[in-house]
Amino acid sequence: MGQKVNPVGLRIGVIRDWESKWYAGKDYADFLHEDLKIREFISKRLSDASVSKVEIERAANRVNITIHTAKPGMVIGKGGSEVEALRKALNSLTGKRVHINILEIKRADLDAQLVADNIARQLENRISFRRAQKQQIQRTMRAGAQGVKTMVSGRLGGADIARSEYYSEGTVPLHTLRADIDYATSEADTTYGKLGVKVWIYRGEVLPTKKKTEEGGK
């Protein structure tokens, strides 16, 4: 069932880590909803800053947030003004002390979330879904991917009946757990309704580090 399951969730504990890192007993539901609020708030506030993912860690009454973005300058702002305003807003939203880290994404064309968002924005600007997918696949392969697959679903070209069309290049081994596959979804709001975008990017295998064993008596 490797074709059906989310490739990121399948690899957690193998080559991937959790995006929310905390432990909770009876506060689990409250923390979970707080995480959802934080991610939704950051997504809306930094909608133009190419944010890929938000990692959240908790310790006592403190929340550490790591924002992965392709445009760190836009998130930080002049003299750190934007990130400080964001921190204050999150302080009031959560009622806790918030610390924000910014991590730059060096190659945006190898990040599935940024690629999916880019295709969705092109679809909203009335660019052909075929052209948008093919151009993005070429850019991703040139950036160093070993394989990429994209799929757009919905009323393509304003058709009465919704359908899905996908394009792929290279290999995307979904069953291989050591394969570093990034997966993301996005949505495009068009005049005919919503279009769904899915992206799979295969960035190569992640090999476990070999432990050096000393051989005695030689």
From Swiss-Prot:
InterPro entries: KH_dom, KH_dom-like_a/b, KH_dom_type_2, KH_sf_prok-type, Ribosomal_S3_C_sf, Ribosomal_uS3_bac-typ, Ribosomal_uS3_C, Ribosomal_uS3_CS
Role of this protein: Binds the lower part of the 30S subunit head. Binds mRNA in the 70S ribosome, positioning it for translation.
CDD domains on file: KH-II_30S_S3
Top-level division of the source organism's lineage: Bacteria
Family: Belongs to the universal ribosomal protein uS3 family.
Biological process annotations from GO: translation
Source organism phylogeny: Bacteria, Bacillati, Bacillota, Bacilli, Bacillales
Native organism: Bacillus velezensis (strain DSM 23117 / BGSC 10A6 / LMG 26770 / FZB42) (Bacillus amyloliquefaciens subsp. plantarum)
Residue intervals of the KH type-2 domain: 38-106
Keyword field: Ribonucleoprotein, Ribosomal protein, RNA-binding, rRNA-binding
Subunit structure: Part of the 30S ribosomal subunit. Forms a tight complex with proteins S10 and S14.
Protein name as catalogued: Small ribosomal subunit protein uS3
NCBIfam families in UniProt: rpsC_bact
Gene: rpsC
GO molecular function: mRNA binding; rRNA binding; structural constituent of ribosome
One Pfam family hit: Ribosomal_S3_C
Alphabetized PROSITE patterns for the sequence: KH_TYPE_2 (PS50823), RIBOSOMAL_S3 (PS00548)
GO cellular component: cytosolic small ribosomal subunit
